[in-house]
Amino acid sequence: MAGKKNVLSSLAIYAEYSDPESDGETGVDAVGGATEEKGGLVSDAYGEDDFSRPGGDEDGYEEEEDENSKQSEDDDSETEKPEADDPKDNTEAEKRDPQELVASFSERVRNMSPDEIKIPPEPPGRCSNHLQDKIQKLYERKIKEGMDMNYIIQRKKEFRNPSIYEKLIQFCAIDELGTNYPKDMFDPHGWSEDSYYEALAKAQKIEMDKLEKAKKERTKIEFVTGTKKGTTTNATATSTSTASTAVADAQKRKSKWDSAIPVTTIAQPTILTTTATLPAVVTVTTSASGSKTTVISAVGTIVKKAKQ
């Protein structure tokens, strides 16, 4: 009962700040002023020129978004004031793990039939006319002028940092391998370290080294051929018969090329040695009168080659 009272009270407070559907333009203006005084959902500072500023003027848009988010948080804090809540329910909800809540919800949905699963109803009340006009103008600018919000965000200086992806993951504490499915359906962190490619590469390298070593050992083995016992005599007889037939066939198949090449012998020159005994004294006349003589002693052998 306490939970139902809280929901009804929050809806009643939200209805007070929202515009009634039956009000006209005057009623809308009055309610808009009331929401501005009381800190409504959307402030008038959320103006038309948020995206008309060139270059890096989108920072003002971020500041206005922060102000609007703060105001919405204030409204939520006002609507969430409990009247007389049961402290046991709050403590139990705080103690439970969010993953357990998701798992329990998924189990309930999986056990339901397709007819029982329905889309939740739209929230009661009406959105502020100022916010509707704002969205309508932005949509018209997108259709007519081709304004792209993603391009405006990407053009900012803060998003030109090459390491912005890692910084955002660290700042927002995002789990890249995480999932919204419960663990009983899919658990991305349930794999062991051996399942990742680094450990698989190491194991593969070890197995390849073992195979290479085995191949090297196989090449070192010496194979010895053997013959059966009792077949030695037959083997020798057959070998001699085959050898004799091979010799006979070779003799029958002689051709002109099998004849021996005649070898021509070149006669070596004969050396004749003649021994000549020359006189011991040779007289040489130096003048016509022959009065003076000189003596030359000559003793030896003269070698003479025979003419061919």
UniProtKB/Swiss-Prot annotation:
Keyword Cytoplasm among UniProt keywords: no
InterPro entries, alphabetized: SAP30BP
Stretches the record annotates as Disordered: 15-101
Compositionally skewed regions (Acidic residues) per UniProt: 57-78
Gene Ontology CC annotations of this record: intermediate filament cytoskeleton; nucleoplasm; nucleus
Leader sequence residues: none
Residues with Phosphoserine modification: S18, S22, S43, S52, S113
Keyword terms, alphabetized: Isopeptide bond, Nucleus, Phosphoprotein, Repressor, Transcription, Transcription regulation, Ubl conjugation
Principal location class: nucleus
tRNA processing as UniProt keyword: no
Recorded family membership: Belongs to the HCNGP family.
Description of how the protein assembles with itself and partners: Interacts with histone deacetylase complex subunit SAP30.
Listed name of the protein: SAP30-binding protein
Species this chain originates from: Mus musculus (Mouse)
Gene (UniProt): Sap30bp
